[in-house]
Amino acid sequence: SELPYIKQLFIPPFTGDNGTSYVAAKLGMPKTERLAPAYWGPAFAAESVEKNPQKFKLKYTKKEYINDSVAELLGQNKIVAWFQGRMEVGARALGARSILANPTQANLRDYINAKVKGRELWRPFAASIIAEKKFDFLTEDVNEPFMTKAIKVREEMAPRIPAVIHVDQT
C-alpha cells in the first residue's frame, strides 16, 4: 500500500452484491488459512463450444499445443477468447474466461473496448505477467490472484505495454 499506516489489506474477488451471501456463509464455516479459487461458476462441455461457434461469430479451432498456438496468434496481433473449465465468480476474468491480446498494441485496447466489450475507451485492462518477470514490470512485490488492486508499472516499462497501462500508470 502507498499508505504507511496500512500494512496489509485483503479484498475478496467478488466485491459486489453477489459476495454478500458468500461472506455470510463463510462466517458460519470453520476458519481456513486461504481463500479457495474463485472458479465456482458453471462449466461447459467442449462439445457445446465446438458445435456453436458460428452463433457467436467465432472461429473455433482445436490445437494439440494450445499455448504455442495462442502465443503465435498474439504475436500476430490477433485477439483470442480463452475459455477453460468453470467460470469465475465475480467481475474479473481470472484466466478461465478471458480476452487475450498483445499488450504492446494500444490500438488493440481501443478495439476491444469499443467493438468486443462495447464499453468506454478509458476502461483499463489487466496484464498477465510471468511471476519471474514481475519485478521487471511492477513497482511492488505483490501477488494479486483476484485482480482487486491496481499496481503501478515501472516508468521505463510503460511504453512497452501501452495496451494495459491506465492513465495513473497502473
Put a short name on every predicted segment.
Residues 2-170:
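Flexible beta->alpha loop and helix N-cap segments adjacent to enzyme active/binding sites
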